[in-house]
Amino acid sequence: MHGLLLAATLLSLPFNAVAHVPPTTGLVRRGVDLDSFRLNERSQFKISEQVEKDSGVSALHSRNYVDVATRLVKRVAPKATFRLVDDHYIGDTGVGHVYFRQTINGVDVDNGDFNVNIGRNGRVFSYGNSFHTGDVPESNLRVKEDPSNPVQALHGALKALRIPIKAERAVAEATNEEDDEDFVLKGTSGALADPTAKLVYLMKNDGSLALTWRVETDIGDNWLLTYVDAEDTTKVHNVVDYVAHATYKVYRWGIADPTEGELEVISDPWNLRTSEFTWHGNGTTRFSTTIGNNGIAQSNPTGGSEYLNNYRPQPADLKFEYDYSPSMNPPSTYIDASITQLWYSANTYHDLLYMLGFNERSGNFETNNNNQGGKGNDYVILNAQDGSGTNNANFATPPDGRPGRMRMYIWTRANPPRDVCFEEGTVVHEYTHGLSNRLTGGPANSRCLNALESGGMGEGWSDFFATAVRLKPKDTRHTDYPKGAWVANNPRGVRQYVYSTNMTTNPLVYTTVNSLNQVHAIGTVWATILYEVLWNLIDKHGKNDGPTPKFRNGVPTDGKYLAMKLVLDGLALQPCNPNFVQARDAILDADKILTGGRNQCELWKGFAKRELGTGAKWDPRNRVGSTRVPVICRIFT
């Protein structure tokens, strides 16, 4: 194949929502700033309105949505070589989503992505493109085929990032006898799984290509893809972290934390339309503990990687009824209640997201997909009272077909300490990292929220969904919400500002991002903008205070669930590593698909209030804000 093609190109595809690692965890403890290895956003995004004006593109038509998408890529990038990624699907709105990866000399350009959205009419609806358009090598420069090269790349990654893996005895084994570009690195210690190395191209921030080894290492707090220069393994061009960290909230669904309600016994809470085997089966086995098709929950006091044999409650007759009070101490005395709460919240959210469109085809987390598309064997590993850290939580999202991993820690900012499993918003926030990473760029690509701005939006989507599900019947647009207030023992929460539609209470606007360089801060701006959109839709359509949406012709009948649905659909439409403007446009297009555009003005007004109006411009250093809305929205105000 392409041997140790240590030639001139490197690629780094953004995979998973990369959240800022708090200063007490993972590589940050070792003085490594992973944010310094991020790539810039580079995707172009053509929305439906632009596609309609391009007669050549709008004329493309076929009953086969993959064929139409392929023809589009050939038209837009006639000189490029590429391959079809095997995660295309038709979503519940009838839109087909197709994903392509650029190749050069037979080697993937890891951040060369092209996503195409095909409407129900068999025509192109919108598309995103981050293909490399500059010079490409005529052939890969080969070096002596030395099988130690992947090992040298591993050593380079370990040294540059201070990754605590011992690799003195590491040896490279090809994953396929005919493939000399993809290796498993045996003989290491300190990782949760054997590291791997794959030869890929990467587009660097200066637009040039570099040939790199994509070295994958999982040490728990950080699950990294490190792009090591193939010719000089002391150079690292880009780092992707599958683990998204955060800080945040549960009891009955909708109760944010123990201050809002009491424990109560709930019977058979699952929905058989979304969890057809209930929460305790997988189609072949019925379990009497917290194991099922959607997840596996257990305690993990040591913080280790093993979980299958960890402790789980196993009550008689599936009666998971355990006492808990925030005054109980130490946390280990209520571990049964903690696991049960985490299990309930994660499964409930799985079912809600399924109703909103995050199903097997689009890459959700299930062991048995029951012939509904996508790749199975990717339940969520749910670790309660995880001993690998404190005052945090995180979620790791590998591509479809590999389990997600949620780790929930004890928080020590109150006395007695507080268990984050009882704060619903934290569970939702973390799980939403899995949602946003699987939908953006396609289920097979968890690297599409890896740039600084897109990674920040990853935090924002997580905060948005966590806030939306906690709304109360008496809430209005004047209701403010903090994030993580209970677990942090701080009424202001863990964000700079509470979420509010009041510009004095929360003054964040689009151009605020010009002065920010940390993903949670950027995410707070994005979630603030979405909070405005949420209330505009609620004011128009009302608010369903029930735990599940009601639909009419596939459209949620109320504003809260409609907002969640449009944001979710926008994730599937937007390009890999989007910026604020592109993500805004994807939500607007999602409304055109779902409702025929009946909510365009409500959306525009929400965006424009926070400077993301029609005149907003994106530049990584000088974003330009705009409070303008389309003329029709001004006429009918």
Curated annotation (Swiss-Prot):
Any Pfam family matching the protein: FTP
Record-listed E.C. numbers: 3.4.24.-
Signal peptide as annotated in the record: 1-19
Job description of the protein: Secreted metalloproteinase that allows assimilation of proteinaceous substrates.
Chief location category: secreted
SUPFAM superfamilies listed in its UniProt record: Metalloproteases ('zincins'), catalytic domain
Glycosylation site list: 282, 502
Family according to the record: Belongs to the peptidase M36 family.
Cofactor(s) listed in the protein's UniProt record: Zn(2+)
Annotated InterPro entries: FTP_domain (IPR011096), Fungal_virulence_M36 (IPR050371), Peptidase_M36 (IPR001842), Peptidase_M4/M1_CTD_sf (IPR027268)
Cofactor note: Binds 1 zinc ion per subunit.
GO biological process: proteolysis
GO MF assignments: metalloendopeptidase activity; zinc ion binding
GO cellular component annotations of the record: extracellular region
Annotated coiled-coil segments of the chain: none
Binding residue positions for Zn(2+): 429, 433
Protein name: Extracellular metalloproteinase 10
